[in-house]
Amino acid sequence: MAIKKVGILGATGTVGQRFITLLSDHPEFKIAVLGASARSAGKPYAVATKWKQSIAMPKEISQMSVKACDPKEFSECDIVFSGLDADFAGEIEKSFRDANLVIVSNAKNYRREPTVPLVVPTVNTDHLDVIKYQRQENKLDRGCIITNSNCSTAAVVVPLKALQDAFGPIAQTNVVSMQAISGAGYPGVSSLDILDNIVPFIGGEEEKIEWETRKILGSVNSTISGYELTDNVVSAQCNRVPVIDGHLMCISVKFAKTSPTPDQVREVLANYVSEPQKLGCYSAPKQAIYVFDDSTPDRPQPRLDRNNENGYAVSVGRIRSDSIFDIKFVSLVHNTVLGAAGAGILNAEVAVKKGLM
């Protein structure tokens, strides 16, 4: 397979930096262009950014000249990954698609568009098939927009997908989140607000989980031109907690028909295999869902489990019967890997494998 040249929009931000760490030694994708704001354009990357990752900035990246977020600067790229903030992403990403470029976006702006795939790679890569209709609709032969989910949504939909496939439709889902501060970007939440504290509000977050879950767990329509939302009714309450990385979610599920036992749920989750695994994608986890049994009742924990499978796995524990719903459990996702940049990369890997780009 020929190596794909890729670009990164918002390369100096938190998500952009995570894209760089995950792509710097990727065997199939090579970083060709870094894009950021006008004040960063023209500067060496090492000068333009405040590097906040736990591993060193790759040497070959540090001296790359940052470009403006202009499609002309990215014309050589096969794929452009966007880590842009939603305040800027809408117009810029559309201009890239209109220039016949492939955009894989972490921003919320196009997630609700009828012909734009909203994909968590270990859940619903079949939704990528609608790319063909999106191109037809916009009279493009190559350009398109693909979005990945909100970071917290990923922790919800991966286990729900496995359960839905095994036990049939889910009627109701209740979610209470404990979300890491890196989800707010840099500089993010003030230390005076988060130290010795929990903030029981994250603007827009609950609505994202409630709606995105229904699109992701839904299906492609009969004409492969859009999506049918699932009937699952989702209620979410979101909290910011003093953890750097890793969103922990307490989830309760009521099924429309079958009510499985905790042991049945454990078995289904442990044996779940996603399409990226079947396709042999480079970034695909060997185990999509890590399952903790009753011998480890205090897991998963962000500090101990967020890096399972290099952050591409979801970890699930405390699986129990629920007196109001049917089943309850705790789910953990690395919010900047499977919940952000990693999802975009794995989505692109799947799209390449399927001949969609």
From Swiss-Prot:
This is Aspartate-semialdehyde dehydrogenase. Pathway: Amino-acid biosynthesis; L-methionine biosynthesis via de novo pathway; L-homoserine from L-aspartate: step 2/3; Amino-acid biosynthesis; L-threonine biosynthesis; L-threonine from L-aspartate: step 2/5. GO terms for biological process: homoserine biosynthetic process; lysine biosynthetic process via diaminopimelate; methionine biosynthetic process; threonine biosynthetic process. Catalyzes the NADPH-dependent formation of L-aspartate 4-semialdehyde (L-ASA) by the reductive dephosphorylation of 4-phospho-L-aspartate. Mediates the second step in the biosynthesis of amino acids that derive from aspartate (the aspartate family of amino acids), including methioinine and threonine, the latter of which is a precursor to isoleucine. It catalyses: L-aspartate 4-semialdehyde + phosphate + NADP(+) = 4-phospho-L-aspartate + NADPH + H(+). The modification Phosphoserine is found at residue 323. Pfam families: Semialdhyde_dh, Semialdhyde_dhC. It is found in: Cytoplasm, Cytosol; Nucleus. The gene is hom2.
